Amino acid sequence: MAKLLSFSDESRSALERGVDALADAVRVTIGPRGRNVVLEKKFGAPDIVNDGDTIAREIELDDPFENLGAKLIQQVASRTKDKAGDGTTTATVLAQAMVREGLRNTAAGASPVELRRGMEKAVAQVVDGLQQRSQPVAGDAIRQVATVSSGGDDEVGRMIAEAMDRVSADGVITVEESKSLATELEVTEGMAFDRGYSSPYFVTDADRQICEFENPLILLTDRKISAIADLVPVLEAVQKSGSPLLVLAEEVDGEALATLVVNRNRGVLQVAAVRAPSFGERRKAALADIAILTGGTLISEDRALTLDKVQLSDLGKARRVTISKENTTIVATDDHRAAVADRVAAIKRELDATDSDYDREKLNERIAKLAGGVAVIKVGAPTETELKNRKLRIEDALNATRAAIEEGIVPGGGTTLLQLADGLNGLVEQLEGDQRTGVEILQRALVAPVHHIATNAGHNGDVVIEAMRNSGQGFNALTGTYEDLMAAGIVDAAKVVRLAVQDAVSIASLLITTEVVIADKPEPEAPPVDGGGDPMGGMGGMGGMGMPGMGGMGGMGMPGMM
C-alpha cells in the first residue's frame, strides 16, 4: 500500500489538530457538571455517554495524519482504562495540554529530547508527591470514591460500598442490566477465576472485548479436547436446546477449537471455550468445585466418564457467564446452595487436616471462591440509552473504588494535581535550559483538569485556580464553594491520578519528539460489483477440512454420518 509522508512542523501540526479534535470532545465530560456526548450507532438508537474512553474509541478523522494524532490520545485513554479502570478523561486532558505546550516550545526552537527529559524528571517527583499525600481507605471512603467517580450519584456510592462489605473488597462484583427501572444489589452464588477465552472469535461484545452468555449450559472436563468427534453429541443436543454453551476443559485446540469458532461465527451455536483454572490435581479440584456450584458433572477418566456419552443432564447451568481475555466470572443460580455449603464444609475439614502452609493457602482460596459469592449490581433506567450510560458510570465507579483500596485516596476535583504542580517550583529552580522548560510544561498541564472542571460548572477557570491557591482549599464544582475536599468526601483514587499523569506524559513526550509521520494513502473507492452477488462466493461446509462425518451435524457445517 502506498504511503503518505509528512515532515517537521507540518507533521506535528497535523498530529496536534488530531489530538485537539479528540480531546475537545472528551473534556466536556470532566467533573460533576460535565456534559454528555451523543454517539451515532450504525444500528439502533444513538448512545448518550459521559465516559472518556467510550467517546475516544468512537472518533475517526478524515485526514490520515490528524487521525494518527487522535489514535495516540486514544491510546492514553485505553491504557489508563486498562490499568486503573477510570481516569480516562483526566489523562486525555493532561495529554492535550502537554502536547500543546510541548509543540509550541518545539516550534520556538527548543530541543524535543531535552523537553522530554525535563518532563520525565518532573513526573517522577509528581508520583513521589502523590504517594506522600495518599491516605489509606477507611470508614466511609469507599462510598465517597464511588460517588465521585459515578458523577455524584449517592445511590451508586452506597450500593458499591454495600457490595464490597458483603463479598469483601477482593470479592467478585459484576454489573448487569436490569429488567426493571430500579437499580438493585443482589448477592448470589458464583465464582471467578483467571482464565479467559481460548479464541478472541468468541467475543460477543466487541466494544468491551468480552463474551457474555445468559442462562448458559456448561461442559466440565479435565481432558484436552482436540478432535471434534468428542464434542459432536453434546453440540447437537445443545443446539436443539437453544442454550449457549461454555466448554471448560484442560484445553480446547486444533480441529475442535476451529469448528467451535466457525459455528459460533456462522450463528449456528452460541459457544465459547475456556481453559480450566489451576494445574494438575488442583485443576481437578477446581473443576469439581465449579461442578458443585453449577449442578453439573465433571467428565473425567477417574470416573470412567467419556465425552461422547455426555447428556444434557450432565451439563452445569448458570445464570450468566462473562469471559474476558484474562478472566471468567460464573454467576450461578440459587438451586445448589446446600451442595455448595456441604462442599465448603468438606474443604474446611481438609484444611484442618493439612500441615502445609501452601496447601492451606490454596484451600482457603477455594473456600473464598465458593463461599464468597458474587455481588450483582442490576442497573435499571427508563430508556435503553440512559441504562447504557448509567452502566458505564457504575463500572467506572467500581474500578475507581478498587484502585482506591490498592493505593489510597487523595483530595479530588483536580486539587491534588494543582498542589503537585506548585510543588514542582523547586525542581524548576534546580534545572535550566530546555529541561527546565519541560518541567514547566508538566506544571501548566497539571492545572488543566481543574480549569476544565470549573469551566464545565459555569465558572471562570483562571479565577477558580487563583482562588484555590490563595485559600489553600479545593473547589467543589457541585456547590461552587471552596472547602476541604477530603473532609467533604470529594476524593480520587491515588492510583487513578498516578496512571493518568504517567500515561499522559508517556504519549505526549513521544509525540513532541516526532519528526516524520507516515500514514497509509487512502485508496479510491472500488466500483460497485455488477449483479450484487457475493464476491466471496460462500465458504462451503466444513467437509473441506477433511473431517469425517460426525453424526447429523450437517447443519453445523459438517456432513452427516451414515
UniProtKB/Swiss-Prot annotation:
Chain sites annotated for binding ATP: 29-32, 86-90, 413, 476-478, 492
Chief place where the protein resides: cytoplasm
GO cellular component: a single term: cytoplasm
Swiss-Prot/TrEMBL catalytic activity: ATP + H2O + a folded polypeptide = ADP + phosphate + an unfolded polypeptide
A single GO molecular function term of this UniProt record: ATP-dependent protein folding chaperone
GO biological process: protein refolding
UniProt EC number: 5.6.1.7
Keywords, alphabetical: ATP-binding, Chaperone, Cytoplasm, Isomerase, Nucleotide-binding
Protein function: Together with its co-chaperonin GroES, plays an essential role in assisting protein folding. The GroEL-GroES system forms a nano-cage that allows encapsulation of the non-native substrate proteins and provides a physical environment optimized to promote and accelerate protein folding.
Quaternary organization: Forms a cylinder of 14 subunits composed of two heptameric rings stacked back-to-back. Interacts with the co-chaperonin GroES.
Official protein name in the record: Chaperonin GroEL 2
Taxonomy of the source species: Bacteria, Bacillati, Cyanobacteriota, Cyanophyceae, Synechococcales
